[in-house]
Amino acid sequence: KPQTDAYPELPENEDLTMHLAEAARIKVVPHSLIHLADGSLGYITRRIDRAKRGEKIDMEDMCQLTLHPTEYKYKSSCEQIAKAIAAYSSTPRLDLVNFMQVLLFSFVTGNNDMHLKNFSLYRPKALYQLSPAYDLLNVAIANPKDKEEMALSINGKKARIKLADFLKASDTMGIEQRVTLGLINGLRDAMPAWIDLINNSFLSDEMKQNYLDLIS
């Protein structure tokens, strides 16, 4: 992904946000920044639907699993994804917790673009499981005019989301509230590492401060 005039510093933003996820013990796809021919930074990831020798690995995104055409990728809810995970994952209880962790992380880091195509199940070996996270990005600092907080509704809401909404969604998804609260504490514990990563990132000083202000 190269730089874009419409949304400055997106490659640096996405690579940093993926590193923040790793610091919070969220599995993510392999990723990196690279220098492009014009000297600017670009963002790359490695495909996880191909094995080392090029064999195809089964992978279905949530548009496919919930029978939504791509143009309706925003017309669903987090709870609907949870239903698909419960129905198709080989390890649904674990994957539901991992899914909630990504939802919480995305909310805290200003990512309101986690639509149906940004969650997938794949089968790297014999079992279907939630794929490592991808397309993690702080949209709030890249596009501050967008006031929605979630791409997909949670507890019927896309904005003004509170802890109670995540806890209610946890109940709906079959996740114990204490587990969700534990995930939130895990994100809090990662905050010192996040601050270091942001301060040492390739973002401009202004963008660094915007990111720090958002998560503080």
Model regions: which residues?
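Small/polar glycine-rich anion-binding or flexible loop at a beta-alpha turn
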Residues: L36-D38, F99, G182-P192, S201
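Short coil/turn segments at secondary-structure boundaries
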Residues: M59, S76-E79, L96-N98, G182-L183, ...
